[in-house]
C-alpha cells in the first residue's frame, strides 16, 4: 500500500456489534494485497440506519458488511438489490455500481461453498435444518440450489419454522421431535453452542448422533469447534465448521469491492484469532 494514498473506507454495521472478525479479515487482506483500504466497525442503532445510509452516500464509503438487525431494514434504503436479496429478503453486503448504492447477499454463497468443495454423496439427500432465522433462509436457498430438496425445518418457536416452511415448501417438525427425522445432513443455524451463555449447549441430542452418520454443519464459528461438531465428529460424522461459511461469504464481499480474492494470510489471521481464545 502506498503510504501517501488515501485509503478507501469500508465498514461493518450492526447493533449491538460486539466483537466482529470482519475488520481483522478484510484489513489483513488490504494490507497483504497492497490495496489502500480500511474497514471499520460501526455500531448503528436501528433508528439511525437511514441517517447512516445518507452518510455512506455523502462520505463516499465504498462498501459495508451488514449484520443483525439491519439485514432486512436496509433494503428499502438502497437503489438496487440483487436477485439473491429479493429471494431471501435480506442483504449482508453494500457496494456501489456506478452511482447506485446496491445490496447483495453473500450468505447463500458462503453457505454453499464447503458443500460444493466436498459434495454430499448420492445417498445423502435428506436434510434437517435446526433453526428458522435469517441464516436458515440462506441455508435452505443454498441447499435447493445444490439440488437438495428433501428438507425438514425445526425451530424452538414453532411459528418461525412454519413461516419458513411455507415460504420454501418444506416439511416442518416440532423441536422436541427433531431427533426422529432420518436425516443425512444436519445443519445448525441456531446460536446454541456459541461462545457465552450457550457454549455448553448443542442443538441436537448427543445420543441421536450414534443412530446414523452423515454431515454435521454448524454455522456457529465461536468457538472454533462447537459442542455439536465435537460430538458429531466423535460419532463418525463429517463436520463443517461455521468459519468456512464466514470466510467464504467474506471472500465474495471482498471480490465485489476489489476484484480480488482474500489472500490466505487473511484467512489464517482469523483462524489464529479463534484458536487462540
Curated annotation (Swiss-Prot):
Database matches in Pfam families: Shikimate_dh_N (PF08501)
> Which residues are shikimate-binding?
20-22, 67, 92, 107, 221
State which Enzyme Commission number(s) the record gives. Answer: 1.1.1.25
Q: Which cystines does this chain contain?
A: none
Q: Which SUPFAM superfamilies match?
A: Aminoacid dehydrogenase-like, N-terminal domain, NAD(P)-binding Rossmann-fold domains
GO molecular function annotations of the record: NADP binding; shikimate 3-dehydrogenase (NADP+) activity
Q: What class of enzyme is it?
A: oxidoreductase
- InterPro entries for the chain: Aminoacid_DH-like_N_sf (IPR046346), NAD(P)-bd_dom_sf (IPR036291), Shikimate_DH-bd_N (IPR013708), Shikimate_DH_fam (IPR022893)
Q: Which residues bind NADP(+)?
A: 83, 131-135, 219, 242
What metabolic or biological pathway is this protein involved in?
Metabolic intermediate biosynthesis; chorismate biosynthesis; chorismate from D-erythrose 4-phosphate and phosphoenolpyruvate: step 4/7
Enumerate the catalysed reactions.
shikimate + NADP(+) = 3-dehydroshikimate + NADPH + H(+)
Q: Which HAMAP family match?
A: Shikimate_DH_AroE
Q: How does it assemble?
A: Homodimer.
Q: Please explain the role this protein plays, according to its UniProt record.
A: Involved in the biosynthesis of the chorismate, which leads to the biosynthesis of aromatic amino acids. Catalyzes the reversible NADPH linked reduction of 3-dehydroshikimate (DHSA) to yield shikimate (SA).
Protein name as annotated: Shikimate dehydrogenase (NADP(+))
Q: Which organism is it from?
A: Pelobacter propionicus (strain DSM 2379 / NBRC 103807 / OttBd1)
User: What taxonomic lineage is listed for the species of origin?
Assistant: Bacteria, Pseudomonadati, Thermodesulfobacteriota, Desulfuromonadia, Desulfuromonadales
Q: Which gene encodes it?
A: aroE
